């Protein structure tokens, strides 16, 4: 088992939730945390503990982005008008790797980050290899012609479920997608309940 897979399993067990909705998640078999003390009875979380867990869950879901990046999203979310929690989710869903994943060009958020890093994606006709690049409404994302037959893409194309959220218009025949608008929290198809306002409270302490 690779270190990355082990890290995913460890986070799932620590949180007690299958945050990526993976069939092989260890929490599908056991609900206690990792390590020798994982089976101890869990007490009620403090406000800080609840906020920390919400942060770990949301940050981990997006291929475990760095703390530095996540703090930048928080700073931008509170600067923007409107609900800061909604703003935070909107910023995360605008990440290029998130849009690639939501478009179902690849099977997982981690695969999407790698796919973008390796230069397989164009935005409005221009090659972009930065996973954190923020897509704007109206932007068109496409898989490079030479990358369409890669195994990672072919495997995703064979998935039975290729549901794409309403804020993305995807053409899987052409391997293109248009980001139509910034979504609200209720529109984002998270496998588990996310609490972005708890994340805002965590950083506001």
Curated annotation (Swiss-Prot):
CDD domains cross-referenced by the UniProt entry: S4
Family: Belongs to the universal ribosomal protein uS4 family.
Subunit details: Part of the 30S ribosomal subunit. Contacts protein S5. The interaction surface between S4 and S5 is involved in control of translational fidelity.
Protein's name in the database: Small ribosomal subunit protein uS4
Domain S4 RNA-binding: 94-156
Swiss-Prot/TrEMBL GO biological process terms: ribosomal small subunit biogenesis; translation
Domain of life: Bacteria
Function: One of the primary rRNA binding proteins, it binds directly to 16S rRNA where it nucleates assembly of the body of the 30S subunit.
Pfam families, alphabetized: Ribosomal_S4 (PF00163), S4 (PF01479)
HAMAP family hit by this protein: Ribosomal_uS4_B (MF_01306_B)
InterPro entries assigned to the protein according to its UniProt record, in alphabetical order: Ribosomal_uS4, Ribosomal_uS4_bac-type, Ribosomal_uS4_CS, Ribosomal_uS4_N, S4_RNA-bd, S4_RNA-bd_sf
NCBIfam families in UniProt: PRK05327.1, rpsD_bact
Keywords: Ribonucleoprotein, Ribosomal protein, RNA-binding, rRNA-binding
Residue span of region Disordered: 15-48
Entry GO CC: small ribosomal subunit
Claim: Nucleus is one of the keywords in the record: no
Keyword Membrane assigned: no
Coiled coil: none
Spans through the membrane: none
UniProt GO molecular function: rRNA binding; structural constituent of ribosome
């Amino acid at each position: 088992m690779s270190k990355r897979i082990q890290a995913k399993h460890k986070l799932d067990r620590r949180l007690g939730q299958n945050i990526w909705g993976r069939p092989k998640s260890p929490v599908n078999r056991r609900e206690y945390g990792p390590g020798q003390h994982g089976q101890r009875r869990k007490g009620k979380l403090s406000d800080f503990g609840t906020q920390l867990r919400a942060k770990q869950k949301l940050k981990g879901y997006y291929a475990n982005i760095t703390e530095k990046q996540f703090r930048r999203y928080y700073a931008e979310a509170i600067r923007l008008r409107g609900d800061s929690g909604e703003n935070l989710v909107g910023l995360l869903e605008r990440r290029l790797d998130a849009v690639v994943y939501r478009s179902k060009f690849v099977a997982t958020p981690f695969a999407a980050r790698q796919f973008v890093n390796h230069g397989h994606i164009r935005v409005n006709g221009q090659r972009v290899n930065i996973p954190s690049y923020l897509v704007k409404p109206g932007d068109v994302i496409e898989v490079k012609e030479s990358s369409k037959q890669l195994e990672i893409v072919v495997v995703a194309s064979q998935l039975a479920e290729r549901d794409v959220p309403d804020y993305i218009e995807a053409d899987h025949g052409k391997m293109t997608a248009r980001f139509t608008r910034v979504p609200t929290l209720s529109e984002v198809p998270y496998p588990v309940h996310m609490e972005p306002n708890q994340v805002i409270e965590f950083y506001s302490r």
